[in-house]
Amino acid sequence: YAQLLCELRKKKGMTIEEARKLVLNPLYLGCLIIKNGDADGQLAGARNTTGDVLRPALQIIKTTPGITCVSGAMLLLTHAPEYGKNGILVMGDVAVTPVPDAEQLAQIAVCTARTAKSVVGMEPKVAMLSFSTKGSAKHEVVDKVIEAVRIAHEMAPDLALDGELQADAALVPEVGASKAPGSPIAGNANVLIVPSLEVGNISYKLVQRLGHADAVGPILQGIARPVNDLSRGCSIEDIYRMIAITA
């Protein structure tokens, strides 16, 4: 595995001696085992930061073809069956990219939709969230979401996606019909894309704590093979749930 790492990083000037030291790090070794085809995925992070987990994954496994932005999705298992898929919502990005540009936000939307379909089995209905609904407010951050919607439609023409939508317009049929008449997503969204990491992290934790929802994740997206990151405050239940998702 040291030889493989040396080959992968030779353009960066890595020597075999440096590679031999790095493979003693389980995070590097795990990614090398995956890269070599000897394992299918990795779950880490109970004792490491997200940066520690992502660094070897991006250096060794790299991103999914066509994707340059790594992100994290959170499954929100709420007690409100009228929302999402029997109360299940998927939110992104909640873990990785602090201030995505329009291109990155579009990639986050497409990747989160794929996660919703592959992990939850839901047909994704993606709402690009904002403090504006269909031009109700004017601001450069709203313009970014509008541009991300356009790019996402180009990336995935068959994906059910719309924006910009406020959260209530995305989730509540009556509000959606009033604020965004004719929208295929308003009032029926099950995948929520937030405009920044700050919004995502705050939002899911408010839903988790005040709404007593179970938050499962983050599920890392955009890496070519399954690599997932645990919170350092994770429970045994968190670990086995993420093992199942990674598998």
Task: Give the positions of each predicted feature.
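Anion-binding alpha/beta catalytic cores of soluble intermediary-metabolism enzymes, centered on
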Residues: Y1-A186, V191-A247
